[in-house]
Amino acid sequence: GEILQNNHQGNLALGQAEYFKMLWMKTGELFALACELGGSLAGGDPRETRALREYGMALGTAYQVYDDCLDLFGSEAKAGKSLGTDIASGKSTLPVILLCEQAGPEIAAQLGRMIQQWDTGQLNILRGWLSEFNTLEQSQARLESCLADARDALGSVRDSNRRDALEELTRFLSQQSAGLGVA
């Protein structure tokens, strides 16, 4: 997934299908494996470990969408890092993909020029475009869909305490996402 992402660096024509494929192969697979192995080590049966793998894939994908949004709509205090680093390095993020799909070729071309000579002062211009096309809200809707998939996957987890703890992670990520873009 990381290699695929590096191959698409600076590609403003990247579509959502390819973007999500990268997420599944990158963060999704990492979370999926961790959850699957954790379930196996805890004595889960094959059905339960498969469900935990599905949960991890969905949670990891949701987390990556959140991280993409945090980089554009968060605060430096909340992010613990400078904002706009993904766009500065040419990484494709869901809000930017949505912007390019909806805004048309003029804004996409202007964005391409901005990225080539990126400076943090341009983040407010980009945020204006992202806001105009409601890309945060659309990204959050996709994140919530992934979190719903994660919760659905937990139906096969027998231990209610473990299931509740994993569901709590989805609620926490949802709350963090809901706080983005709020001044």
Residue ranges: model-predicted function:
Residues 1-183:
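All-alpha prenyltransferase/terpene-synthase fold signal
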